[in-house]
Amino acid sequence: MSSAAPPDPTQTPEGKGPLSKEVTYYAALWSVGQVRVRELKKKGKVLPLYYLEVPGYPRSVFLALPQSFAQPRLGQTIGFSHAPRTDERAVLKGHLYYIRHLEPHLWERAPYFHLRGRLAAVDLEEGRLQVEVRPNPGGKLRAPFTLTLWAPLSLLEALPPVGSGVYLEGEVRPRSGRLVVRRWEPARLWDDPQ
């Protein structure tokens, strides 16, 4: 994959007010499934662990839910937004942290993802791209992370140069856990050079 050295992700804009949502970094995965609970034994105690069970998602993906929200909804179908992570093969992985509950009118779009980040690499041969999502000043994210995504060749060829800000959206292939980009557009980011 081609790549360029990105600016320091720990830099924050000096002398600026709160960030507009249109320039923040973010990544969100929308899923609809059943609220479930399993028991976790830790230091002799049994703790409930609430999660969203989504049919067809890889077994290696765990969609955590907040106990206060999930406990009264055990067994119900709900939609939720999580912070996605992928491995180097562009497959969803690991323990995904919840962001927020989805209103029912948004459920029909799931499984769906969207993000705003900095294009880190493009591999035309493999049909993949990488996007870096960085912490926003005053945000909860403490360290940048990179998502590896699949995309059609025509979309990859149309992307701007590595280092550019992009907004991407696409779908989750449930059986394989792949995130496939279907649409992109240029995006301004808070740490863009002036």
For each feature predicted by the language model, list its residue ranges.
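Short, compositionally biased pre-sequence/patch detector
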Residues: 2-4
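Structural detector for short beta-strands of small beta-barrel domains
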Residues: 6-46, 108-127
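OB-fold and OB-like beta-barrel modules that bind single-stranded nucleic acids
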Residues: 31-35, 74-84, 117-119, 163-172
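Acidic (E/D-rich), amphipathic helical modules within compact regulatory domains
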Residues: 46-104
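Extended, positively charged loop/linker patches that create polyanion-binding surfaces
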Residues: 95-150
